[in-house]
Amino acid sequence: LVTLKDTLEKYHTLKNDDFILRMTQEEAEIYGQRALALLQKAKDTLCKKYELELKQPTTVEIFAEQKDFGVRTFGMPDNPGFLGVCFGCVITANSPSSQMPNPANWEAVLWHEFCHTVTLTLTKNRMPRWLSEGISVYEERQANPAWGQSMNPKFREMTLGDDLTPISK
């Protein structure tokens, strides 16, 4: 945690009225303004759609090192498989540079996580995770049909066959 504190102190901060975005200086120069604009578009779109007025800025921290994301998010450095996590008005995310050689689409991740900010705020954190995830995945695809996970031959075969565990079990 002490090392993470030192790392965060070196991060560059971009702000507007609705967001506080923290990331490395190098990454801020590459896509920081695009990230801030995307977050603003997500807020404008989703808050209007769900009739929500957020009363405070949302803090978004994008980590260039997966271990820093892990410590900030889970208190431990080794938690592979997570792209981003939302804690209401705080979002943590792995940057594309922490996911090499196959980075995820950072725009889709930020949109998805901000959607959680909306749903968790509206429900005062009282909603099933599966529902919040489903809404975030849905809103990702509404924002950009190229985002999200599409049906592929393997998933189709599993759906049509007996490879999926029924919800009842």
Describe the predicted segments one by one.
Residues 6-8:
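Hydrophobic positions within repeat-based interaction scaffolds
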Residues 1-4:
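Alpha-helical protein-protein interaction scaffolds
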Residues 10-128, 139-148, 154-165, 169:
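Juxtacatalytic substrate-recognition/specificity segment
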Residues 129, 133:
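Short, well-ordered surface patches within globular domains
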